[in-house]
């Protein structure tokens, strides 16, 4: 009746002709067809995952999200995608909310694991899936009764911003795209992953949760439930609002708007531990972007404090990040980036830091690079910055008629230009500082001869400009208290200060001695704690 070739292609013939016209029978057929292709443990996992989300069982959801899903991904889908939506829909009774959440994980897995990254249609579909999720929870008249673990909410917001960043870089690379793809990007889907959409979603989550008001009253010792509203009372909305503030910090940093990046965090007291900072990846990411923004605003003292505090935290909790996972890899990479940024800041603005951080800088040979930077090696500054900075993006995509070039590096090169311009202004200051540290009084002419043995009177007047530059660059705005990270007072951060009377420089060493007592107290307490644990061990 049928030719033999009609039965080829692994039985796809039956998929074309086995429909009866009865919706119920067709649904049962599709369910049996897809589930027969799916490994049993994957099928049971999806069914149990869906049921746990429907029941709001946070313990089971978190266990399956953090443990089972990565394990199955490693075993069955290491370099391939998870089953598509229609395959999963047939075994979870088309549960709408679960399918949206499943697709979020599905597209996240493709971004992280599939060689070559996602295709254009997958990037677009991922965007529309996020739109479905956010429309579901933001546009509802009443709060959506959905319970998800905080770690998932953080990674959802973090991934949302990451995919925006990734898409912005993808669309800026015109050299590897056909005319049809450029048409799709610039005309048919010009609003997909647009900066306005991203900012609108994040601000909407902040507003609907009333998270800013809640943080303000918490700092005043008032119960946040009094201002939370119907949506903000729920942990689901409250945590999404908080994580969206961090998402906005990241977005503005990627765009190079450092003032707005710090401004958006104003309800959060950046330098104080918060009840909302229990997700390590969120806390570390916040400190990375805050510290980087401070550095680019030339607030080196605040940047050093931010990096030092979080790197001490990473040191104390490093056992948590030893297992291999996407978030742990990201945490370890950001920690390494922050050591590079800290080294830059310490060269530009020397000051005392915790001894354990100094020890890490010594062990990882940062001191060699720091010495080169102090000697004015601009290439080391450049390489450290390129390694440690965020991957900047442009808010505006290339025009449809733009030359077929690679525009990905343009935002990075602009930020590098701004940074290196500041470094060039300061590259001679370490030399000046090294001479001043040797004296309590020093004639201007003598200092000029140290710097240039053939110095003339014109060089002495130029030296005054250099000394004024030293004073200016060593004077920073430093945060002291208050909810706004932009507030502060001007302080001199140099280890020495000086004034000029006629042609004589009067120098005062203001270096603060190392507080070794704190270091030894911490080590003694740690040793006592270890001793107590050893005594409690039964042999």
From Swiss-Prot:
Domain of life: Eukaryota
Chief localization: cytoplasm
GO annotation, biological process: formation of cytoplasmic translation initiation complex
A single Gene Ontology CC term: eukaryotic 43S preinitiation complex
Entries under InterPro entries matching the protein: eIF3l, PCI_dom, TPR-like_helical_dom_sf
Subunit: Component of the eukaryotic translation initiation factor 3 (eIF-3) complex. The eIF-3 complex interacts with pix.
Protein name: Eukaryotic translation initiation factor 3 subunit L
């Amino acid at each position: 009746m049928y030719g033999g070739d009609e039965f080829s292609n692994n039985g796809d013939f039956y998929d074309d002709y086995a429909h009866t016209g009865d919706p119920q029978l067709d649904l049962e057929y599709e369910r049996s067809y897809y589930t027969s292709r799916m490994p049993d443990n994957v099928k049971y996992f999806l069914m149990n995952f869906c049921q746990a989300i429907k029941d709001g069982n946070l313990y089971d959801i978190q266990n399956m999200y953090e443990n089972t899903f990565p394990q199955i991904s490693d075993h069955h889908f290491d370099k391939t995608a998870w089953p598509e939506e229609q395959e999963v829909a047939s075994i979870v009774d088309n549960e709408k909310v679960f399918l949206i959440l499943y697709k979020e994980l599905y597209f996240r897995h493709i971004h992280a694991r599939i060689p070559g990254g996602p295709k254009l249609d997958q990037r677009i579909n991922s965007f529309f899936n996020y739109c479905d999720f956010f429309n579901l929870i933001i546009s509802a008249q009443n709060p959506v009764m959905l319970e998800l673990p905080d770690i998932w909410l953080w990674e959802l917001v973090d991934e949302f911003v990451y995919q925006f960043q990734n898409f912005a870089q993808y669309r800026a690379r015109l050299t590897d795209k056909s005319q049809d793809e450029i048409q799709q990007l610039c005309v048919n889907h010009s609003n997909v992953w647009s900066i306005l959409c991203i900012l609108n979603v994040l601000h909407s989550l902040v507003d609907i949760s009333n998270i800013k008001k809640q943080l303000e009253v918490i700092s005043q010792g008032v119960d946040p439930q009094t201002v939370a509203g119907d949506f903000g009372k729920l942990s689901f909305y409250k945590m999404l609002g908080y994580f969206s503030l961090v998402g906005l910090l990241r977005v503005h940093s990627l765009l190079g708007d450092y003032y707005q990046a710090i401004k958006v965090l104003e309800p959060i007291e950046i330098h104080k531990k918060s009840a909302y900072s229990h997700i390590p990846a969120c806390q570390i990411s916040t400190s990375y972007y805050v510290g980087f923004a401070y550095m680019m605003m030339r607030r080196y003292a605040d940047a050093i404090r931010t990096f030092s505090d979080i790197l001490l935290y990473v040191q104390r909790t490093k056992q948590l990040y030893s297992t291999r996972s996407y978030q742990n890899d990201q945490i370890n990479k950001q920690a390494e980036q922050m050591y590079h940024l800290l080294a830059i800041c310490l060269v530009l603005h020397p000051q005392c830091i915790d001894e354990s951080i100094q020890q890490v800088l010594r062990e990882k040979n940062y001191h060699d690079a720091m010495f080169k930077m102090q000697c004015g090696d601009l290439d080391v500054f450049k390489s450290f910055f390129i390694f440690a900075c965020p991957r900047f993006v442009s808010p505006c995509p290339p025009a449809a008629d733009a030359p077929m070039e690679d525009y990905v590096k343009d935002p990075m090169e602009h930020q590098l230009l701004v940074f290196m311009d500041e470094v060039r202004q300061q590259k001679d200051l370490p030399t000046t500082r090294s001479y001043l540290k040797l004296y309590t009084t020093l004639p201007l002419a003598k200092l000029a001869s140290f710097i240039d043995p053939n110095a003339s009177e014109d060089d002495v007047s130029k030296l005054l400009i250099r000394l004024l530059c030293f004073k200016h660059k060593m004077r920073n705005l430093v945060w002291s208290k208050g909810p706004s990270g932009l507030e502060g007072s001007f302080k001199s951060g140099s280890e020495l200060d000086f004034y000029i009377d006629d042609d004589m420089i009067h120098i005062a060493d203001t270096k603060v001695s190392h507080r070794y007592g704190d270091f030894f107290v911490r080590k003694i307490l740690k040793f006592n704690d270890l001793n107590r644990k050893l005594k409690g061990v039964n042999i």
